[in-house]
C-alpha cells in the first residue's frame, strides 16, 4: 500500500476529487494548509501599511491505496490540478506498512 499526499491550489479541489473518483479512488482526506515553495509570498497593502504574505493557502489531499492504483491516482491528480503556472503543487508518495479499519478490525488493503 502507498499513501499519496498532494498539495494543490484550493480552487482545484473539486476537479481533483472528481478525477480521483473516476480513477476508482473511494475515499480521501482533505486538510486546509498554508505554505510556500518557489511561488513565494507576495506583498499586500492594508490600511496604508505594506505587509508580506509568506504562507499561501493550499489544500492537502491524502489517500491510501493499493500499489496497483497509485499510477492512475497520480495521473488523475496531475491532470486535474495542473494550470501550468507556478504554485500548482506537489505530490508525495510514501509506503504504508499497515492499515486497520477500527469498526471491523479489517487490516491491510481490506481496511482501505
Swiss-Prot record:
Pfam families xrefs: P-II
Keyword Transmembrane helix (UniProt): no
Record keywords, A-Z: Nitrogen fixation, Nucleotide-binding, Phosphoprotein, Transcription, Transcription regulation
Family listed: Belongs to the P(II) protein family.
GO process annotations (BP): nitrogen fixation; regulation of nitrogen utilization
Keyword Phosphoprotein: yes
A GO MF label: enzyme regulator activity
Modified residues (O-UMP-tyrosine): 51
Gene assigned in the entry: glnB
One CC-aspect GO term: cytosol
PANTHER family per UniProt: NITROGEN REGULATORY PROTEIN P-II, NITROGEN REGULATORY PROTEIN P-II HOMOLOG
Quaternary structure, from the entry: Homotrimer.
Reported function: P-II indirectly controls the transcription of the glutamine synthetase gene (glnA). P-II prevents NR-II-catalyzed conversion of NR-I to NR-I-phosphate, the transcriptional activator of glnA. When P-II is uridylylated to P-II-UMP, these events are reversed. When the ratio of Gln to 2-ketoglutarate decreases, P-II is uridylylated to P-II-UMP, which causes the deadenylation of glutamine synthetase, so activating the enzyme.
UniProt-recorded name of the protein: Nitrogen regulatory protein P-II
Amino acid at each position: 500500500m502507498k499513501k499519496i499526499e498532494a498539495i494543490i491550489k484550493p480552487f482545484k479541489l473539486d476537479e481533483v476529487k472528481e478525477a480521483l473518483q473516476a480513477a476508482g479512488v473511494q475515499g480521501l482526506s482533505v486538510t486546509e494548509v498554508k505554505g510556500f515553495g518557489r511561488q513565494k509570498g507576495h506583498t499586500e497593502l492594508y490600511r496604508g501599511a505594506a505587509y508580506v504574505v509568506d504562507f499561501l493557502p493550499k489544500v492537502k489531499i491524502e489517500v491510501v491505496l493499493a500499489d496497483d492504483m497509485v499510477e492512475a491516482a497520480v495521473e488523475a491528480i496531475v491532470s486535474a490540478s495542473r494550470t501550468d503556472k507556478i504554485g500548482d503543487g506537489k505530490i508525495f508518495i510514501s509506503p504504508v506498512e499497515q492499515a486497520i479499519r477500527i469498526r471491523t478490525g479489517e487490516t491491510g488493503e481490506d481496511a482501505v
